[in-house]
């Protein structure tokens, strides 16, 4: 496979969230109170909140608007990375251990007790997704945390269900403002590393449309899963190429500054690598925010001044 070359450079803008400065080995991140936003001073506070009366999230949101002011050469987005709730594949791997899972059981569709091909949420996973919804409702009202304007999800069943349970029909008191429309978009690029593991083989297009009708499917979304192979595992480089292609798509075509992405632990680890952020391993049902900066990459001709007019 020939890897693509992005025309954008992505950088994690750190110093805003507690997980931005990870002190040791990768840790299993859970949803922190207020998503771990650090109560700090912003250069926009002088005009926006001179008396320091506004909530920390209100001041951060105003600063994000400032970063994206007209004339800025970079684009900034706040990405809420939501890992799906516990799936049956997670249960099986925990029971038998990673070595046995990787060598044998991950290649099967299930056993006599459970099915983990395109794994669905367990009862625990459903509660985790519902806890996400409760978090969003509480944080939006009490912390003034801005809700995402756009929702993206991996087409795997556990991600679709997590996203739907976390955001569909989310209600806030009238005084707290309106909830952005829930019009989620499915992105193949967000999938977990492809191949061999049946838990990462998706259902058909028809099944997704029937079971999750609110989710829009991108053009070219095939009826059958044409990306997953029974005996070939996607390389880490190919996985990273996919995630970078997702960033390219979103930063090039979606103007909203705040998005949610419901996907997989492996996908978010790749994201951390791409943006230069300390590795964050997300626990099932957790939400971790990242502030990401995108800048155009000048080609060599532009740099040496030989580009044509």
Predicted regions, residues:
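Domain-level recognition of soluble alpha/beta enzyme cores
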Residues: 101, 276-301
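A short, acidic, amphipathic alpha-helical segment used as a generic capping/interface helix at domain edges
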Residues: 239-255
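Short, solvent-exposed loop/turn segments at secondary-structure junctions
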Residues: 85-88, 156-159, 190-192, 226, ...
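Catalytic lobes of large eukaryotic enzymes
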Residues: 206, 291, 297, 307-308
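Histidine/lysine/aspartate-rich catalytic loop segments that bind and position anionic ligands
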Residues: 185-195, 201-231
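Active-site-proximal alpha-helix that buttresses catalytic centers in soluble enzyme cores
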Residues: 2-181, 186, 209, 231, ...
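Short aromatic-enriched loop/helix-cap "lid" or pocket-rim segments at secondary-structure transitions
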Residues: 90-96, 164, 196-200, 273-274, ...
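Beta-strand elements within well-structured catalytic alpha/beta cores of enzymes
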Residues: 77-82, 152-153, 257-267, 271
